[in-house]
Amino acid sequence: MTDLQWETFSYQAVEGASVLYFLAMLAYFVELAGLRTVARDEEVEDRRTAMAGRLGLVLTSFAAAVHLVALVARGLAADPNRVPWGNMYEFTISGTFVVVLAFLVVTRIWGTEWLGPLVTTFVVAALMAAFLGLDDTVLPLPDALNSYWLVIHVVSAVISTGAFTIGALLSGLYLVKSRSTRETGYLARLTDLAKLDRLSYRMHAFGFPVWTFAVLITGPIWAHQAWGAYWNWDPKEVWAFITWVVYAAYLHARATAGWRGRNAAYLALVGVATLWFNFIGINFFSSASQHSYAEGLGQEHSVVVDVLAPVEATQEVGIVVGSDQPAL
């Protein structure tokens, strides 16, 4: 297949995965609509309601498989072939896949299928935003990104993002359930508060060392290789460190101050807010960041690359690339 055929196939696979996620979301909501609005100990699910929930999980699994195919095809569409992490569109479709994968793994281990409606709604919204608002042109990687550190750094960052996102969903559900005076419908499907709190903690405890590896180890090493300095106080670096501090405070407070329940849940939500602001806000609103890779449809974007000169000074080169024109 040619590069153009791989690119077209990737688009079609993403569209197919989006349709499957949407159908899974509908199945989950059909399950919720079929729940009796009575107390947990009186609630009885009919066969069709249970089948809708199982169908939602099966559709989510199939969607994830198609989603993975789309990512592979996206990488094969580039010349030379590369990992699909060259711009915000590619990061979005990669990140949403990891969120779904984390959901499926957690559901397999701890039976958290009740997260399905939230996860599929989030993924459908994110993929729709990627389709409508981001430039999906396949371009070669800038020199600064063309490194094996891209794989090491981004894999760890994306894995931790998936864990933190699932942890935040669990924390949000904890807060909603803890304020409810009567457990009916969806809330009756949730596990008890103690387990919600414990599952959220486990997701954050898993994600934090991976995020540390991405932000404080591989990131600085890669920055030194690309730009000649381990730390540049770039806006994205600063916000990544802020996110690290928030999650460090979360884990420290739980371990030493005995924070549980609402206080820990609020802090977890602050952490995920800084995480996603770093991904979305910095890319769209900070033109000074060397990490900016966001572009809308038909919009020009700037990639700033520091080229180390043979002399002591560092020369900064700006490359402006339009969505419909080749790189200069």
Language model feature labels by segment:
Residues 1-328:
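Polytopic transmembrane helical bundles with strong interfacial aromatic enrichment
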